[in-house]
Amino acid sequence: MRYDVQELLLHQSAEDPFARFANGMAYHPFLQLTQRPTDFSVSSLLTAGSNNNNSGNTNSGNNNSNSNNNTNSNTNNTNNLVAVSPTGGGAQLSPQSNHSSSNTTTTSNTNNSSSNNNNNNSTHNNNNNHTNNNNNNNNNTSQKQGHHLSTTEEPPSPAGTPPPTIVGLPPIPPPNNNSSSSSSNNSASAAAHPSHHPTAAHHSPSTGAAAPPAGPTGLPPPTPPHHLQQQQQQQQHPAPPPPPYFPAAALAALAGSPAGPHPGLYPGGGLRFPPHHPGAHPHAHHLGSAYTTAEDVVLASAVAHQLHPAMRPLRALQPEDDGVVDDPKVTLEGKDLWEKFHKLGTEMVITKSGRQMFPQMKFRVSGLDAKAKYILLLDIVAADDYRYKFHNSRWMVAGKADPEMPKRMYIHPDSPTTGEQWMQKVVSFHKLKLTNNISDKHGFVSTTILNSMHKYQPRFHLVRANDILKLPYSTFRTYVFKETEFIAVTAYQNEKITQLKIDNNPFAKGFRDTGAGKREKKQALMSNRGSDSDKLNPTHVSSSRAPLHLGHAGRPPHLHPHAALLDNQQDDDDKLLDVVGPPQSPLLPLSHSLQQMHAHQHSAALAAWFNHLAGAGAGASEHAAAAAANASAEDALRRRLQADADVERDGSDSSCSESVGGSTGGAFRPTSTGSPKEAVGAAAAAAAAGLNPGGGSYPSPNISVGPPIHPSPHLLPYLYPHGLYPPPHLGLLHNPAAAAAMSPAGLNPGLLFNAQLALAAQHPALFGHAYAAAGHTPVSPLQGLKSHRFSPYSLPGSLGSAFDAVTPGSNANRSGDPPGGGGGGLGGGVVENGPRSLSSSPRPRPASHSPPTRPISMSPTTPPSLMKQPRGGGAGAGVAQSQHSPSELKSMEKMVNGLEVQHNGSAAAAAAALQLAEEAAQHHHHTQAHHQQQQHQSHHQQQHHQQPAQPHPHHQTHLHSHHGATTGGTDQ
C-alpha cells in the first residue's frame, strides 16, 4: 500500500486534535502536512515497518469485535483496515485511524481493555499510545514481535496484560485494538486531551513513554476471553515479521507528525511515543519541538536509508534489548541562581574567542543504571525566531532572527562513562564556550556559534550508549530547563544582570570596580542601550521560546537543566550559545538545505563556503551550503514558527526537570514532553555538527550540531515552517532528497550531525564528503551520485541535482580537472573511490574552487559524457556528449569551451586541466585495467570534477562505454 503523505498525515478526522495541529505541522521537514500534494510516498517509510502491505481484512474482525463495544472503535478499525496489511495482522494501522480513534469512548476501551491490550500487543495497534497503559501495550506488542523497536526504556509488560497505570494517574482505559491510541494515547492527542494526563505524570521521565508499569492499578477488566481471542486471531493472523529497521528520520518524522506516529510505521507500537502531559505542562508544546534532537538525527538517517538502501539504516538501539532498566532524572544545579537570572532576563556574553557561560550549565543525574554507559550532551538552540533589543530597561522584539549558524552538540568530555560515575558527580558543561565567530576553527570542539541579541535555550541530552559512534542508533533523552534560557549579547545590556553576575561569579573581574574600566565601558554601552530593568520577563522569554518547543507537545518541561551556575562564575560573561539556532532554522536548513540542494545550488555553494568558514571539510562546505540555503528559509520558518511557538511557548516551561522520562521513550519517540523530538533534533544537530567540523570528525566527543535535521515533531526540533521548505524538502523521504540530505552538499547542519552520526554508523551516504576526504570509497548510492559543485548551472533535476550535485553543466564547468575530479583520472584506482580519486589525483583545475563534489553515483542528470567532455576539450566534449541529451551536451560544450575556462580562470587553465585529465585518464587506464569502468569514471570524473567516485557498476559501465569514446579523444 502506498500512502500519500497527505493521506497519512491529513487523513485524520477534522475534529482530531492532530488534524487541528496538522496545519501547524506543515513545516515538518520529512512529512509535509501541507495541503499541497507531494510526490513523496510514505510507502518507503512504511516499507520498513509495513511487512503487510495488503490486507484490509486483518482488522475486519477487530472492527467487528470493537464495533460491539464502541462505534468509534469501529470507525477507527475501519480506517485501520485500509492501513493494515494482512501480514501485519493489523500491526500497521493507518495513522488517521489511530488519530480518529483517539476520541474513542472509554467505555468501549474499558470493555475491550484486556482484549485490546492483548490484541494491541499482538497487533501493535497501540503504536501511537502515549499513556503508560498504551506504552505497556506497546511493550507487550514488541515482546510478541520479538524485536522491540521502541526506544522506550521500560521493560515490556507481558502481552495480554492490561497496561499498568502510572501511580497517581487515573487508570486510562487501553485504546481500542484498532484505535491504536485513545486520545491520551496519541502524542498529539495527549497534548490535546490533558484530562488523560495528570500533572504528576510528566514529572517522572518514565511517565508515559518510558514509565515502567506502575502496577495493575486501574487496569480495565479483561474482556471475555472469546472476544479477546477473536480480536487476537483476526489481528494476529500472520505474526508480522519483525519490521525492518525503520529509518530513524522517517520514524521521527511520522512520529512527530501532527497525526502522531503512524501505526504502520511503528509495527507493534514498537516505537512508543511518550505521552505529552498537557496537564503537567499547560504550556507544553505540540509535536515538533523547536530543537533538532538526537532522535531527529536517527530518524533522518533512517529515512535516508529508506531512500538509499545502500546506506545502513540508523537503528535505534532498543534499550530493552540491553536489559538495562533505568529511569533517568536530571536536575539543574544552581537552579535558584538560574531563576534569579531568568527573572531579569538572562544574558550571556559571546566573544570572538568564546566565553564560558555563567551561571554554568551543571546537572545532577539520577536513576541511571550503575553499570550501563551513558553519553551526556549539551546543545544550545534558538529559543525563537526573533532578534531582540534592550530598550527602556526591557527586552523587546526588534525583528526576525538572523540566520543561525550550524549548531553543535557538545559532548561531555567524560562521555561515555558508567551511570554510577555520572550519578556520583555534578555534570558540568562549563568548558562550553559561546562565540559569534563563524570562522572559529576550534568551535566544533568546545564552542557554539550564537547570534548576538538572539534568545537561546540550552538542552541537556542523555544517551545510553557505550560508544559515541552509536549515538545515531541510541535513544536520546532531552531535558530542557526553561530557566536556562538566555539572550546572547556582546556586552551586558541589563545592569541588573551585570550586578548579578558580579555578585555570584567570582571570575567576573571585568565588571568589578577593579576591572580597569572594563566594567565602566560596558556599562556605558549598556546605558546607551537603555539597559535599566529586566531585559526579559521570564514569561516573555518563555513565549519567545515557544517556537522551539512548538514541534513537541510542549517544550520538554521535564528538561530542567540545573546547571550549577556558581561553578562557572568564571564565565561571568557567559555567551549565549545557540546550538541549534532557531528551532525552525536548524530544522529548515536540514530539510531546506535538501530542497535547496536541489533547487538552490548557488545557495548550496554559499552554504558550502559557509561551512568551510566553519572549519568543516569540503563535505562540511556542502553541508554548509545546505545550511546557508537553510538560513534564508530559516528566517521565514522562524517567523512562522515563532508565531506558533509563542502560542505554545507560554506554558512550555521546563518545570518538570524529571519529566524527561517521557523523553526516555526512544530516539524515535518524542520525549513525553516532546524531548524525543528535541533529542532527535539534537542527534541530528550532532550529526550535522559532526559533518560541519568535517565528516571525519564525527567520533569526536563534541558533536558539532549544525541546524539539526528538521524533525517534524522529533526530526524537526528546529521546526521550520514547511512552507519555507520547497516540496523537495520532502525529498528527504525521496530517494533523491534523502540522497541530497545525505550528500554533503545537501546536508544542512542538522543533516550534518546526522551524517556525522551516520558516519560513525558508517553511512557513506551521509558522510560521503567525509569519505571523500578520507579517501574511502563511497558505499552509499548517494556517494555514488555526484554532488553538485554548486555550479552556476541549474542541476538538471531537483532530485538528481541534490545528489547529482554535479549537473552536466556543473560537472563540465569543473570538467577541466576538478580539484579532486581531475585527480580522479590520475587517481586511477583511487578514482573508484570518488573521494579518494579527488584526494589522490592532482587538482589541475584548482581554479575551479567549487568544493570537490562528493562522489555520488553518477546522477542521470550528469551524463558520463560530461565526464568525458572536459577531457576532450571542445572536441572531446562533443564526443562525450554524443551519448548525452542535447541540453547536457550544450552545457558540456559550454563548460569545455567557455565555462570551463571561466572556472579555471583562463582557456589555458582549462586546456592544462584537460591535459592533466587526459594524462591522468591514460595513466589510470593503463594502471587499472581491472577498474576500467572506474578508469572511465575517473576520466569522466576528471571532466566532471566530482564524478570520480562512482561506485555504481551500471554507471561505471555506462561511463566505460563513454570512456571508450572519451579515452580515444583524451588519450589521443
Swiss-Prot record:
<feature type="modified residue" description="Phosphoserine">
    <location>
        <position position="887"/>
    </location>
</feature>
<feature type="compositionally biased region" description="Gly residues">
    <location>
        <begin position="818"/>
        <end position="831"/>
    </location>
</feature>
<feature type="region of interest" description="Disordered">
    <location>
        <begin position="805"/>
        <end position="889"/>
    </location>
</feature>
<feature type="DNA-binding region" description="T-box">
    <location>
        <begin position="332"/>
        <end position="513"/>
    </location>
</feature>
<dbReference type="Pfam" id="PF00907">
    <property type="entry name" value="T-box"/>
</dbReference>
<dbReference type="GO" id="GO:0001745">
    <property type="term" value="P:compound eye morphogenesis"/>
</dbReference>
<feature type="compositionally biased region" description="Low complexity">
    <location>
        <begin position="177"/>
        <end position="193"/>
    </location>
</feature>
<dbReference type="GO" id="GO:0007476">
    <property type="term" value="P:imaginal disc-derived wing morphogenesis"/>
</dbReference>
<dbReference type="GO" id="GO:0000785">
    <property type="term" value="C:chromatin"/>
</dbReference>
<keyword id="KW-0804">Transcription</keyword>
<feature type="region of interest" description="Disordered">
    <location>
        <begin position="508"/>
        <end position="563"/>
    </location>
</feature>
<dbReference type="GO" id="GO:0035265">
    <property type="term" value="P:organ growth"/>
</dbReference>
<feature type="compositionally biased region" description="Low complexity">
    <location>
        <begin position="97"/>
        <end position="142"/>
    </location>
</feature>
<keyword id="KW-0238">DNA-binding</keyword>
<dbReference type="InterPro" id="IPR008967">
    <property type="entry name" value="p53-like_TF_DNA-bd_sf"/>
</dbReference>
<feature type="compositionally biased region" description="Low complexity">
    <location>
        <begin position="201"/>
        <end position="212"/>
    </location>
</feature>
<dbReference type="GO" id="GO:0005634">
    <property type="term" value="C:nucleus"/>
</dbReference>
<feature type="region of interest" description="Disordered">
    <location>
        <begin position="44"/>
        <end position="248"/>
    </location>
</feature>
<feature type="compositionally biased region" description="Low complexity">
    <location>
        <begin position="49"/>
        <end position="80"/>
    </location>
</feature>
<feature type="region of interest" description="Disordered">
    <location>
        <begin position="263"/>
        <end position="286"/>
    </location>
</feature>
<dbReference type="InterPro" id="IPR046360">
    <property type="entry name" value="T-box_DNA-bd"/>
</dbReference>
<dbReference type="InterPro" id="IPR021101">
    <property type="entry name" value="Optomoror-blind_N"/>
</dbReference>
<keyword id="KW-0805">Transcription regulation</keyword>
<feature type="region of interest" description="Disordered">
    <location>
        <begin position="645"/>
        <end position="676"/>
    </location>
</feature>
<dbReference type="GO" id="GO:0007472">
    <property type="term" value="P:wing disc morphogenesis"/>
</dbReference>
<feature type="compositionally biased region" description="Pro residues">
    <location>
        <begin position="213"/>
        <end position="225"/>
    </location>
</feature>
<feature type="compositionally biased region" description="Low complexity">
    <location>
        <begin position="835"/>
        <end position="851"/>
    </location>
</feature>
<dbReference type="GO" id="GO:0045893">
    <property type="term" value="P:positive regulation of DNA-templated transcription"/>
</dbReference>
<dbReference type="Pfam" id="PF11078">
    <property type="entry name" value="Optomotor-blind"/>
</dbReference>
<keyword id="KW-0597">Phosphoprotein</keyword>
<dbReference type="GO" id="GO:0006357">
    <property type="term" value="P:regulation of transcription by RNA polymerase II"/>
</dbReference>
<feature type="compositionally biased region" description="Basic residues">
    <location>
        <begin position="952"/>
        <end position="963"/>
    </location>
</feature>
<protein>
    <recommendedName>
        <fullName>Optomotor-blind protein</fullName>
    </recommendedName>
</protein>
<dbReference type="GO" id="GO:0001708">
    <property type="term" value="P:cell fate specification"/>
</dbReference>
<feature type="compositionally biased region" description="Low complexity">
    <location>
        <begin position="226"/>
        <end position="237"/>
    </location>
</feature>
<comment type="function">
    <text>Essential protein that may function as a transcription regulator. Vital for pupal development. Required for proper development of the optic lobes and wings, and abdominal pigmentation.</text>
</comment>
<dbReference type="InterPro" id="IPR001699">
    <property type="entry name" value="TF_T-box"/>
</dbReference>
<dbReference type="GO" id="GO:0048100">
    <property type="term" value="P:wing disc anterior/posterior pattern formation"/>
</dbReference>
<dbReference type="GO" id="GO:0048066">
    <property type="term" value="P:developmental pigmentation"/>
</dbReference>
<feature type="region of interest" description="Disordered">
    <location>
        <begin position="918"/>
        <end position="972"/>
    </location>
</feature>
<keyword id="KW-0539">Nucleus</keyword>
<dbReference type="InterPro" id="IPR036960">
    <property type="entry name" value="T-box_sf"/>
</dbReference>
